[in-house]
Amino acid sequence: MQTTINNGQTSSKETLLTPRFYTTDFEEMANMDISGNQEDFLAILEEFRADYNSEHFIRDEEFNQSWSNLEHKTKSLFIEFLERSCTAEFSGFLLYKELSRKLKDRNPVIAECFLLMSRDEARHAGFLNKAIGDFNLSLDLGFLTKSRKYTFFSPKFIFYATYLSEKIGYWRYITIYRHLEQHPEHRIYPIFRFFENWCQDENRHGDFFAALLKSQPHFLNDWKAKMWCRFFLLSVFATMYLNDFQRIDFYNAIGLDSRQYDMQVIRKTNESAARVFPVALDVDNPKFFKYLDTCACDNRALIDIDNNNSPLFIKSIVKIPLYFSLFANLLKIYLIKPIDSKTVWNTVR
């Protein structure tokens, strides 16, 4: 018997760290002039049309077994991983599908790119939801569509955030895949075998958003762009780091040290971003991860306070110094002198 999960049944609260659903200014995006980067868009569109993974997401006989042998805590953490991943992929599907619909008459090349990316995201979400089904659960994607709150971002911010989301997704998947390729004894479920090809979808999507950013030079070439790029780099890195700090046991179950894994992913994503953004974060500064560790501990303490039985008023008072410490350390990271990446735009590949 399968249980359908909807938002009201999940234990995770809506927080800054949960996967989000976005909308944007469709009119502004329709009016964008992409002619300065037209060749790149046409090349990317041909890549999307090729649909290299059309036959990849097909379940094989390894899925046809009972997973009751998984230790209870590991199973719970893995199901949460699947749910969060499915929600994030489905969020991308909804955004890209809506963009393709709104832009098809005004910017057909960009519209078709979004349509084909929505195909990929839907495929990923469906594959993840089938995996959830192996544990007699199913994520109610229709309920998610109707019930989730949508966050408005201007196109510029959508480009920054989604470029980084796709690139960090690539590095997360490929890092896990390469680790489990070397240590198959830690592959607790067959979905990890699919990550090598899967992550190439993420990489291609990231390349599309890189082309969008480069087609709008004012998104990259002034002091405000530098400030926003630093902000989004820090936001994406800190969100992943704080989330994964709560899920150390899951990474242990697949043979990974979550901190070392996150450090590797952050470094690689930062290198990728340096090919597009005018600045990169100085992740090799010893203070960078020191401050992130403090943020992760503060966030963990805030969660522990939420989970105890103290009166709400007492909880609120106890949280104040933790919030102050958390945001103060994030500000310290933001103020670490960034690296000017313009010098490597034409040399780093």
Swiss-Prot record:
HAMAP family: AcsF. Catalyzes the formation of the isocyclic ring in chlorophyll biosynthesis. Mediates the cyclase reaction, which results in the formation of divinylprotochlorophyllide (Pchlide) characteristic of all chlorophylls from magnesium-protoporphyrin IX 13-monomethyl ester (MgPMME). Its cofactor is Fe cation. It holds the Pfam family Rubrerythrin. It catalyses: Mg-protoporphyrin IX 13-monomethyl ester + 3 NADPH + 3 O2 + 2 H(+) = 3,8-divinyl protochlorophyllide a + 3 NADP(+) + 5 H2O. Its EC number is 1.14.13.81. Keywords: Chlorophyll biosynthesis, Chloroplast, Iron, Metal-binding, NADP, Oxidoreductase, Photosynthesis, Plastid. Pathway: Porphyrin-containing compound metabolism; chlorophyll biosynthesis (light-independent). InterPro entries: AcsF (IPR008434), Ferritin-like (IPR012347), Ferritin-like_SF (IPR009078), Rr_diiron-bd_dom (IPR003251). It is found in: Plastid, Chloroplast. Belongs to the AcsF family. GO terms for biological process: light-independent chlorophyll biosynthetic process; photosynthesis. This is Magnesium-protoporphyrin IX monomethyl ester [oxidative] cyclase. Gene3D superfamilies: 1.20.1260.10. GO terms for molecular function: iron ion binding; magnesium-protoporphyrin IX monomethyl ester (oxidative) cyclase activity. Transmembrane segments: none annotated. It comes from the Eukaryota. The keyword Chloroplast applies.
